[in-house]
């Protein structure tokens, strides 16, 4: 998203038959004169994706579920908190539950510890190859891990996955004994 405010987003029909639409936004860059207008071809992939997610969130039926794969794909890391705040605020106001996936450490860091109860880690069971989902708050070593740094950094360093693997090995050993 641009560093300055987007003042207005709108679409107009275009083309020979007026059957296509073009997205436009007005950005507040100058203190004088009309704001510059940028069409979709001049917007970054991250801006377009952010606007698409916001549109989906605003148009979902109330009390529904919105699932977004790689929610931050194409988005500048500095905008991670803005994206999270929007998803939480607009989702709560509209009664829309939001389920997202990410591999982005910046987004995980922006979640902070207050989101721990809502974070699930997916990894593979080495014995079966199946995906295993683990609630972050169910990791026994989580307090020690969080003392070492934010969630994104822990994930980047492989510490969360390593802790889960250690717990899985310990569970397997208990079953064998």
List PLM regions with ranges.
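C-terminal lobe/lid and adjacent interdomain/linker elements of RecA-like ASCE P-loop ATPase modules
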Residues: 82-177
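Intrinsically disordered, low-complexity Ser/Thr/Pro-rich tracts
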Residues: 73-74, 95
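A broad, low-specificity signal for short, low-complexity segments enriched in glycine/proline
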Residues: 59-60, 80-84
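Walker B catalytic acidic pair
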Residues: 69-70
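Alpha-helical structural signal
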Residues: 44-47, 80, 104
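Phosphate-coordinating catalytic segments in nucleotide- and nucleic-acid-processing enzymes
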Residues: 1-50, 54-61, 148-177
């Amino acid at each position: 998203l641009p560093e300055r405010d987007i003042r207005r987003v709108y679409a107009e029909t275009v083309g020979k038959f007026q059957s296509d639409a073009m997205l436009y936004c007005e950005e507040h860059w100058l203190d004088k004169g009309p704001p510059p207008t940028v069409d979709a071809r001049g917007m970054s992939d991250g801006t377009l994706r952010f606007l698409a997610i916001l549109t989906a969130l605003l148009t979902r039926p109330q009390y529904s579920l919105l699932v977004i794969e790689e929610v931050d794909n194409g988005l500048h890391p500095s905008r991670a908190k803005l994206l999270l705040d929007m998803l939480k605020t607009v989702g709560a106001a509209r009664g829309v539950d939001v389920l997202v996936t990410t591999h982005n450490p910046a987004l995980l860091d922006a979640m902070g510890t207050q989101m721990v109860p809502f974070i699930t880690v997916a990894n593979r069971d080495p014995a079966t190859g199946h995906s295993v989902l683990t609630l972050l708050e169910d990791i026994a070593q989580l307090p020690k891990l969080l003392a070492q740094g934010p969630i994104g950094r822990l994930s980047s360093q492989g510490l969360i996955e390593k802790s889960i693997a250690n717990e899985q090995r310990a569970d397997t050993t208990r079953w064998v004994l």
